[in-house]
UniProtKB/Swiss-Prot annotation:
The lineage of its organism: Bacteria, Bacillati, Actinomycetota, Actinomycetes, Pseudonocardiales. NCBIfam families: PRK00281.2-1, undec_PP_bacA. This is Undecaprenyl-diphosphatase. Its main location: membrane. InterPro entries: UppP. Its EC number is 3.6.1.27. The gene is uppP. The keyword Hydrolase applies.
Length: 273
């Protein structure tokens, strides 16, 4: 039951800029008495990233084919798709390197709900500032390597629960002058290599007797991952439509209010950090 509930939470929150890992930690501690754990979070993210792969299958195939063709064809190397493929590759490096170097902190100390609450509020404010002051004039065809590096670096901050991978990358994209739909779409593409790598590397840790957090059976883990993916697919479709006509202020205020509520719950001892 716990694994299914948390899978739905994962699917609902993975692509919204409100921190899926933060929500998993809050819900699991508040309703089930213990943290779901970084390993469970990482593995269920495979399901949500499969949703991205299915949703953007056409884009992904085009980028992969163009990238391989560009390795041997100078004319192809001048296309935007070839450059975009490199932006995704380079932008995925920061989170991979930092995730490897600081994996013990990610599974342990950084999962304090005090940190989660602070990051929810801080990055909510930063997202609001990016929405308010970002130029939002550059579309998909204006993406650069600088965008890939800086948005990839922002993605790495999501190793801290409460930051939000999509929240960090969308905030960075808006700050760099990208329009909202472009920032969101590139955020999704940027996540695929890093999240799949993290999920695969954590599969064995979920079932270790000494592992921190939830320890589901193999069957429960598979079902939870599928559920997270199905819910996540619906959220992708909704979010892409939403940002076409709406600002991200809804998520800004949600993050700030949730962070304040979390501080209140911690302060009154309703939930343990």
């Amino acid at each position: 039951m716990q694994a299914m509930v948390l899978a739905v939470v994962q699917g609902l929150t993975e692509f919204l800029p409100i921190s899926s890992s933060g929500h998993l930690s809050i819900v699991s501690k508040l309703f089930f008495g213990s943290d779901a754990g970084a390993s469970f979070t990482a593995v269920t993210q495979i399901g949500t990233e499969l949703a991205v792969v299915i949703y953007f299958a056409g884009d992904i195939v085009r980028l992969v084919v163009t990238w391989f063709r560009g390795l041997v064809n100078a004319e192809v190397r001048r296309t935007q798709d070839y450059r975009l493929a490199w932006y995704v590759i380079v932008g995925s490096l920061p989170i991979g390197v930092l995730g490897f170097l600081f994996q013990d902190y990610i599974r342990g100390a950084l999962r304090s709900l005090w940190i989660t609450g602070a990051m929810l509020i801080l990055f909510g404010i930063l997202m609001g500032l990016a929405e308010r002051f970002g130029a939002q004039r550059r579309g998909h065809d204006k993406l650069t390597m600088r965008d890939g590096v800086l948005m990839g670096s922002a993605q790495a901050l999501a190793l801290i629960p409460g930051v939000s991978r999509s929240g960090g990358t969308i905030t960075a994209g808006l700050s760099l002058g990208l329009d909202r739909p472009t920032a969101v779409r590139f955020s999704f593409l940027l996540a695929i290599p890093a999240v799949f790598a993290a999920g695969v590397s954590e599969v064995s840790h979920v079932f270790e007797p000494s592992a921190h957090g939830l320890q589901p059976t193999g069957a429960q883990m598979i079902v939870a991952t599928v559920v997270a993916g199905v819910v996540g697919y619906a959220v992708i479709a909704w979010l892409l439509r939403y940002v076409q006509k709406h600002s991200v202020y809804l998520f800004v205020w949600y993050r700030i209010v949730l962070g304040l509520v979390l501080f209140g719950l911690l302060g009154f001892g309703v939930i343990q950090p």
